[in-house]
């Protein structure tokens, strides 16, 4: 343990290590996917909210957006925790609960941690990014269902209690983390299925409608394979 991550707490006596694991900046990765899709003819409408599916006699005929109707006979719902809200006219729904994950980002500091750290019971993970910032994430926590608005977008804000609890877990694993000033805090909502595996299928009673939801926090890692399946 000390050879790989010498500054971890002395409370840690053993760990597993996977040389092929890694991590990447999720924002930069999504932007790279977007640019690659555009090179292949994909058109994005950012900020265009889908209000309703247009279904007639068991067939999809289009979707109603915040800027008008889009006629189509094929649609993939891959909208995470919002998926079931768009399927109220169907007998199908994705079984999911919606917990929140507390995420804390620090100001950049000197590089002291190379591997991604995860705790065995999955209640905390951390990594040091290329910039030097640390990013800590809690495990799945109960969410009260409330959303606020930030930069004209819905925003899930974790409670101070959850922030402090996540920090304490981080300090127990990496004591030097106490010297890193906090830069930002936010909450991430999980579309968590009972077995923590996604549902990718045709919607049985609506011809032309497909669903990919319930990724349970694994979407970033399995996205490349998911694209081939869909």
Residue ranges and their predicted role:
Residues 204-230:
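C-terminal lid/capping helical subdomain adjacent to the catalytic/cofactor pocket in oxidative enzymes
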Residues 16-74:
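Helical element adjacent to the flavin cofactor pocket in flavoenzyme catalytic cores
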Residues 110-208:
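Active-site lid/adjacent beta-loop-alpha segment flanking the redox-cofactor pocket in flavoenzymes
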Residues 62, 103-105, 125, 199, ...:
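Conserved hydrophobic/aromatic beta-strand scaffold that supports enzyme active sites
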Residues 5-12, 54-61, 70, 192-196, ...:
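A short, glycine/Asx- and small/polar-enriched loop/turn
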Residues 1-13, 140-144:
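A conserved beta-strand/loop capping segment in the N-terminal third of enzymes
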Residues 2, 43-45, 181-183:
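General small-molecule cofactor/ligand-binding pocket signal
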Residues 65, 69-115:
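Central helical "cap/lid" subdomain
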């Amino acid at each position: 343990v000390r050879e790989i991550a010498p500054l971890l707490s002395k409370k840690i006596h053993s760990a597993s290590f996977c040389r092929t694991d890694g991590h990447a900046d999720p924002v930069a990765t999504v932007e790279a996917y977007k640019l690659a899709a555009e090179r292949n003819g994909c058109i994005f409408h950012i900020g265009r909210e889908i209000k309703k599916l247009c279904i007639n006699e068991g067939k999809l005929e289009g979707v109603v957006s915040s800027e008008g109707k889009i006629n189509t006979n094929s649609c993939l719902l891959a909208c995470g925790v919002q998926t079931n809200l768009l399927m109220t006219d169907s007998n199908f729904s994705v079984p999911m609960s919606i917990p929140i994950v507390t995420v804390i980002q620090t100001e950049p500091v000197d590089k002291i941690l190379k591997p991604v750290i995860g705790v065995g019971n999955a209640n905390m993970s951390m990594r040091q990014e290329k910039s030097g910032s640390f990013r800590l994430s809690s495990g799945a926590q109960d969410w009260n269902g409330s959303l606020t608005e930030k930069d004209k977008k819905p925003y899930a804000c974790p409670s101070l209690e959850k922030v402090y609890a996540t920090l304490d877990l981080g300090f127990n694993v990496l004591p030097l983390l106490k010297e890193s000033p906090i830069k930002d805090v936010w909450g991430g909502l999980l579309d968590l299925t009972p077995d923590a595996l996604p549902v990718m299928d045709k919607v049985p009673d609506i011809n032309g409608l497909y669903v990919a939801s319930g990724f349970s926090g694994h979407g970033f890692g399995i996205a490349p394979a998911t694209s081939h399946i869909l």
